[in-house]
């Protein structure tokens, strides 16, 4: 098989091997509305079929899907490889960490995800329960819209710098739980080119106050922060927003938190670039630092903050340079330059890289944390 790309993409191998790309039986997909025509992006209608059925060659097949409730996977009788001894998985949506903890302790479930520090502490030492810890590539960030129509005062570059200086990053890590890190910039720990962590002594309230005064707000200002009802690996975005509110009160910024459900308008406003000030999270679409380039001006996420390529053409040009660089040393240099450029400037502040904690029954083996799908069900066996 030969792939012909229309433009350079130094992350192509990472994309092809990530869980979001799957090889399907083309005949089955076409029978159910799929197409490989040039206009497939607008004419393919196989999504509804694939939401409730399988067309691949993996170890498990999808036998039941109830949105927002449950997914059932059963062993594929035609699987070509060596199978594990688990015949069926029932995946249930349960956002409450305490309920997960209790049902795991009682033996009603075998694996619990998105647990909090408190529930993990309760499970430590529990009979027949084991805990696996790790660091995800998921990040939480503050977004300040560059378009004054939506961002108001937070669209001012000096105000953005002041907010960056005022945040208590170590306190944010405490809220997110053990294992959380604060990335230096937009490239997470674990990715090629990452410059590590933002130092704790970066926070400086007096400098933040001066920056705010320089921007014309010596007495601060009031601003709405719209936040959704989502969570980041069990960490409620509303909790992060409250911490940001508390931190910014130290420099005279009065934040009014407005909570809005994702489906009730927040999601559309976020994607359409009409949110002025928010706390949000980002999960990677593939395991390569290039996925973070979408935060640059003109990128998918950049435009959600009103950050067009015209605002910072030099930084926007680094997107193309990073995509074209196939030599690892050259890629690393470009990625480091991008991180330095966004360390103190821009509408995004990465405030946390989320940890992952999985608790599971000790009767299971090989329950490990994976970047691409949290846990790999094809590796788990019953002892």
Segments and roles (model prediction):
Residues 161, 173, 254-265, 293-361, ...:
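Extracytoplasmic/peripheral linker and loop segments enriched in polar/acidic and small residues
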Residues 17-83, 88:
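Gly/Pro-rich hinge or "lid" segments in bacterial periplasmic/extracellular proteins
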């Amino acid at each position: 098989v030969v792939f012909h790309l229309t433009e350079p993409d130094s992350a192509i191998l990472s994309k092809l091997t990530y869980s979001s790309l799957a090889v399907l039986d083309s005949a089955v997909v076409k029978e159910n509305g799929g197409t490989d025509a040039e206009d497939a992006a607008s004419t393919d209608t196989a999504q509804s079929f694939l939401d409730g059925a399988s067309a691949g060659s993996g170890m498990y097949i999808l036998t039941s899907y109830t949105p927002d409730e449950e997914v059932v996977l059963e062993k594929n009788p035609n699987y070509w490889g060596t199978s594990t001894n688990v015949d069926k998985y029932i995946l249930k949506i349960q956002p409450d960490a305490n309920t997960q903890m209790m049902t795991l302790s009682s033996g009603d479930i075998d694996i619990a995800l998105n647990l909090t520090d408190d529930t993990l502490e309760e499970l430590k030492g529990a009979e027949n329960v084991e805990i696996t810890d790790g660091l995800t590539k998921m990040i939480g960030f503050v977004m300040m819209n560059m378009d004054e129509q939506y961002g108001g005062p937070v669209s001012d570059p000096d105000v953005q710098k002041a907010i960056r200086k005022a945040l208590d990053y170590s306190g944010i890590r405490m809220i997110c739980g053990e294992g959380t890190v604060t990335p230096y910039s937009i490239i997470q720990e674990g990715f090629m080119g990452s410059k590590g962590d933002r130092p704790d002594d970066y926070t400086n309230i007096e400098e933040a106050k001066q920056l705010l005064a320089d921007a014309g707000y010596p007495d601060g200002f009031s601003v709405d922060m719209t936040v959704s009802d989502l969570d980041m690996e069990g960490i409620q975005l509303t909790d992060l927003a409250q911490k940001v509110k508390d931190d910014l009160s130290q420099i005279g910024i009065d934040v009014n938190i407005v909570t809005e459900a994702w489906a009730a308008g927040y999601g559309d406003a976020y994607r359409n670039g009409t949110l002025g000030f928010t706390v949000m999270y980002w999960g990677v679409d593939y395991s390569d630092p290039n996925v973070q380039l979408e935060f640059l001006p003109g990128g998918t996420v950049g435009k959600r903050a009103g950050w067009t390529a015209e605002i910072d053409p030099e930084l926007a040009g680094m997107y193309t340079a990073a995509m074209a660089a196939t030599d690892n040393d050259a890629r690393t240099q470009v990625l480091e330059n991008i991180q330095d450029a966004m360390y103190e400037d821009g509408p995004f502040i990465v405030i946390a890289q989320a940890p992952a904690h999985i608790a599971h029954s000790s009767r299971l083996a090989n329950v490990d944390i994976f970047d691409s799908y949290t846990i790999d069900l094809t590796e788990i066996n019953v002892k």
